[in-house]
Curated annotation (Swiss-Prot):
<keyword id="KW-0699">rRNA-binding</keyword>
<dbReference type="GO" id="GO:0003735">
    <property type="term" value="F:structural constituent of ribosome"/>
</dbReference>
<dbReference type="GO" id="GO:0019843">
    <property type="term" value="F:rRNA binding"/>
</dbReference>
<dbReference type="InterPro" id="IPR014721">
    <property type="entry name" value="Ribsml_uS5_D2-typ_fold_subgr"/>
</dbReference>
<dbReference type="GO" id="GO:0015935">
    <property type="term" value="C:small ribosomal subunit"/>
</dbReference>
<dbReference type="Pfam" id="PF00333">
    <property type="entry name" value="Ribosomal_S5"/>
</dbReference>
<dbReference type="InterPro" id="IPR020568">
    <property type="entry name" value="Ribosomal_Su5_D2-typ_SF"/>
</dbReference>
<dbReference type="InterPro" id="IPR013810">
    <property type="entry name" value="Ribosomal_uS5_N"/>
</dbReference>
<comment type="similarity">
    <text>Belongs to the universal ribosomal protein uS5 family.</text>
</comment>
<dbReference type="Pfam" id="PF03719">
    <property type="entry name" value="Ribosomal_S5_C"/>
</dbReference>
<dbReference type="InterPro" id="IPR000851">
    <property type="entry name" value="Ribosomal_uS5"/>
</dbReference>
<keyword id="KW-0694">RNA-binding</keyword>
<comment type="function">
    <text>With S4 and S12 plays an important role in translational accuracy.</text>
</comment>
<comment type="function">
    <text>Located at the back of the 30S subunit body where it stabilizes the conformation of the head with respect to the body.</text>
</comment>
<protein>
    <recommendedName>
        <fullName>Small ribosomal subunit protein uS5</fullName>
    </recommendedName>
</protein>
<keyword id="KW-0687">Ribonucleoprotein</keyword>
<dbReference type="InterPro" id="IPR005712">
    <property type="entry name" value="Ribosomal_uS5_bac-type"/>
</dbReference>
Amino acid sequence: MSQVNVKTVKASEIELKEHVVAINRVAKVVKGGRRFSFSAIVVVGDGHGVVGHGLGKANEVTDAITKAIDDAKKNLIKVPVINGTLPHEMIGKYSGGFVFVKPAAPGTGVIAGGAMRAVFESAGIKDVLAKSKGSSNPHNVVKATIDALVKMRAPHKVAMQRGVAMSKVFNG
């Protein structure tokens, strides 16, 4: 795998919007029966290329969401967004989930499933085509989408690494 340039961001510096992706009721089987609690998956972002995801678990839904938001604020990354879309195609993988993301022409919109849509909207990506394969579990899909976004490379960084002009990066 090539070197991944991930720029982490401090949550206190920016204003973030939260998207609750999924809330699950989970059970722990004990001697007296089942003990129920909740887990929540949340995606946060500023709409300008910063996105993060988090998982929270608690006995109450609101507490689980709060914990997930706090966790998401600790996992913020910066994604290269060019004219509201991605710089290039990429495949993201996590566990059994595979995600294929592709840049789209202006006006296309976000063509993606529910869990992926939350990630793209939080990151401020307005035009993208995405397909999820394998696992449809929201947790795996969110992590695979974040993996694909982490692997994205900005065109100016590619040009700098190759030692060529920006026009050569796109036109060969």
